[in-house]
């Protein structure tokens, strides 16, 4: 579902020999190895650089500061943690148009490079390549400005904002409850809930 080979194949199809794809977080040097990535390394020695989980923090930090863009390629992302990390680090993002990442950056779509996910993988490679070319054709200063603006997409996920949103949920629930129950019944239900919670803790 992650489709990590998508950027590699797109770069190869572009015929750009000066571009490398870094895959960070692949732990393929364990006891059992990782046949998929070992094969990928053999197939794409010029395009692919693998940064395993076992890398030290300095190495990871170096590559995060060296990459031109982060490619979000999964077809199933319930909540895009990688998307959030990318935005937080102010790294230009090449992102798919699926729920999860799309919902996170929907207010800053003009500041990311979106590509359409197609059921046909060959077309998917082509769509991704088009997004990569748009990234390459964008001036580095504009990329930096876009990445800075894209980070504002995280404002709605900050703890203080989420806390206020939960307050609204509880307040609205109480208002609806007041329309169905008397005040004494609501208080009774609150006390019962607190009592049940106390028994569970005990």
Feature names for model-found ranges:
Residues 1-13:
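A conserved mid-protein helix/loop that constitutes part of the nucleotide-sugar donor-binding site
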Residues 34-58, 69:
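Nucleotide-activated donor-binding/catalytic signature segment of Leloir-type glycosyltransferases, i.e.
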Residues 62-67:
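Short alpha-helical donor nucleotide-sugar binding micro-motif in glycosyltransferases
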Residues 75:
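Aromatic "clamp/platform" in nucleotide-sugar-dependent glycosyltransferases that forms part
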Residues 92-95, 99-102:
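Short hydrophobic beta-strand element within catalytic cores of glycosyltransferases
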Residues 134, 141-156:
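A short, well-ordered alpha-helix in the C-terminal region of glycosyltransferases
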Residues 134, 138, 156-202:
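C-terminal alpha-helical cap of glycosyltransferases
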